[in-house]
């Protein structure tokens, strides 16, 4: 199990997530070495789980609890659908210069393909947004998406999440519940990384 986890080492979350914090990763890795083998790390504000992922890769001996309050797992579980949809959108965007705004006609064609995908199941609107919308803008549903201009910012390769959550104990609850659950347990370290005050939290749950 440890060997498999070392094989998949992500420097950032595999799918777009508002508020990822990657700049402190190297210093965080150094701090993790200070704790004992029996330490339980509880990631209270899991987000897209980069902290949980780094912790488990650096400390495979430890227990790591990832609080997936935003249901990031659902997006990971549907990554093959997302890749297939993006592949179709890439084909539709052929001939359109990179970063150029799409015409109203192409806007309608793209929306129709996305609506068809939604009718058969799941659409990861946050990931689709990163390929279609102006930098920093995100839509949470088809209603929000159809009101915005589209740009050809298409990702040129598939997303991959293989092994990303390996070894983590995943829960989904209010962070206060986790604090209470482990309050009196020995060797517990809370990883507290809430969204920055300036972060757009409209995409959070």
Per-region residue spans from a language model:
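Class I S-adenosyl-L-methionine-dependent methyltransferase module
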Residues: 62-165
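Conserved proline-anchored active-site loop of SAM-dependent methyltransferases
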Residues: 41-54, 66-70, 131-133, 184-200
């Amino acid at each position: 199990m440890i060997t498999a986890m070392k094989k998949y080492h992500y420097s950032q979350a595999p799918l777009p997530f508002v508020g990822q914090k990657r700049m402190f990763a190297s210093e965080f890795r150094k701090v993790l070495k200070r704790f004992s083998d029996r330490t339980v790390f509880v990631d209270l504000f899991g987000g897209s789980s980069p902290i949980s992922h780094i912790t488990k890769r650096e400390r495979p001996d430890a227990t790591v609890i990832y609080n997936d309050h935003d249901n990031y797992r659902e997006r990971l579980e549907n990554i093959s659908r997302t890749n297939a949809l993006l592949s179709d959108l890439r084909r539709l965007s052929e001939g359109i210069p990179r970063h150029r705004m799409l015409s109203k006609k192409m806007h309608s064609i793209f929306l129709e393909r996305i609506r068809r995908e939604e009718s058969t199941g799941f659409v990861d609107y946050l990931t689709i947004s990163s390929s279609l919308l102006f930098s920093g803008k995100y839509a949470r549903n088809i209603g929000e998406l159809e009101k915005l201009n589209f740009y050809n910012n298409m990702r040129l390769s598939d997303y991959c999440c293989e092994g990303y959550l390996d070894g983590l104990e995943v829960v989904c609850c209010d962070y206060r519940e986790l604090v209470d659950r482990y309050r009196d347990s020995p060797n517990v370290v809370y990883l507290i990384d809430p969204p920055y005050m300036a972060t757009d939290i409209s995409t959070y749950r």
